[in-house]
Amino acid sequence: MVDVSPERFEELVDDALDAIPDELAALVHNLVVLVEEEPPPGEAQDLLGLYDGSTLGLDAAGYLPDRIFLYRRPLLDYCRTEAELVREVRVTVVHELGHHFGLDDARLHELGWA
């Protein structure tokens, strides 16, 4: 387990988002990324991230943004070093963003983002 402050964790998330290529980021609309300490009751407590929304192009609500949740405590527990945490935050951001673009877990695994 690695331990970083909530502020440092937010920096790592911001860095992961900044690393998304501009061409891809330009396609993202009505999406927010939120950091929570742990998954909600009813979800696996080792869940690293979660996409909550509709697939891009299939906007059902039109008003409320789709959401990517990153769960700080499970990510910290999963990683032994800050370098591992940097990588895992990036992988989790890309994985959940992939769901926004309609990719399922099997395809994300094939692409190395699972």
Summary of predicted features, one role per range:
Residues 88-96:
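Short alpha-helical catalytic segment bearing the HExxH-like zincin motif
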